[in-house]
Curated annotation (Swiss-Prot):
The keyword Ribosomal protein applies. GO terms for molecular function: structural constituent of ribosome. This is Large ribosomal subunit protein uL29. The gene is rpmC. It comes from Corynebacterium urealyticum (strain ATCC 43042 / DSM 7109). Signal peptide: none annotated. GO terms for cellular component: cytosolic large ribosomal subunit. It comes from the Bacteria. Keywords: Ribonucleoprotein, Ribosomal protein. Transmembrane segments: none annotated. One of its GO terms (biological process) is translation. Belongs to the universal ribosomal protein uL29 family. Pfam families: Ribosomal_L29.
Length: 77
């Protein structure tokens, strides 16, 4: 049951919260890749889900950078 974070939920977060989520997701991806290399990974689907979550976070940040969406937590960066 590996489901990702919906983009609509990400759009409600501030830039600081998004960067925090991005950092956490990158750390999780690193750990999953390490588990895969050592043969300890039991849920292969989670690897793909985390990658897509990272892409969604980058997309929301880029939308704000281009002014396509607003930042609910403060000024548009």
């Amino acid at each position: 049951m590996a489901t990702g974070i919906p983009a609509s939920e990400l759009r409600e977060l501030s830039n600081e919260e998004l960067t925090t989520r991005l950092k956490e997701s990158k750390e999780e991806l690193f750990n999953l890749r390490f588990q895969m290399a050592t043969g300890q990974l039991t849920n292969n689907r989670r690897l793909s889900v985390v990658k897509k979550d990272i892409a969604r976070i980058y997309t929301v940040l880029r939308e704000r950078e281009l002014g396509l969406s607003t930042n609910p937590g403060g000024d548009a960066a």
